[in-house]
């Protein structure tokens, strides 16, 4: 195979990996449905998306696509991959030692997914890690910032019963305390933000120039809004884990500290505004993070 053909196939595989990652992180979270349907629909969509992408990547590999070479000597020592394999392995053991391995495999006893969702997620991570061109990550994370901003605004609007997506049209009044949005419910929302906000904040903290700082700072401001208003422990857990990772890296500069102070100021500003609005405007209830801190 000629070198130009090889490069074209490699670019095709890399572009496919970028599109898949963008769909999972940036497009898929905007799916709209009622809370009662999200368990089945989201699993079906996730299963289909992962299966199609993996089959396409297998086809690219069959015609000669190769993973890009690591940019440094330590790139192959990815402890995250070992963590994913360990999690998938423990899920496999717990599934086959459960009272009903079949139900555990597909998650039929409660939230849909079970072992199959874990395995497909692990396979998707491995595929993206293997073929993604790192130069495309900035674009993916920028689009993720847009998605994060949209979901944060929808969350706040739904708190005040401003229903832009028609979620309340056929919902009983007594059920409206459960948050309906692009992610369906506050725990779905919190889990999304636990993944998205560390990335959005990291992009802002490490922006290299003023222009990038502005473009990444806008999603970071909406991320601070989400951090202030989302009533879910999953978000606090995700942010806590991200902070611990940053502390372990020990590569802070005065620029990082200044931008972290801006994020903190935005958080407390949004939290104070939300506290005032909850006290003076009828809402669906829930507790802001600042109120939980006393």
Q: Where do the protein language model's features map onto the residues?
A:
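Membrane-interfacial, low-structure loops and terminal tails that flank and connect transmembrane helices
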Residues: 1-11, 66-77
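Membrane-interface helix caps and helix-loop-helix hairpins in membrane proteins
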Residues: 36, 101-108, 182, 228-232
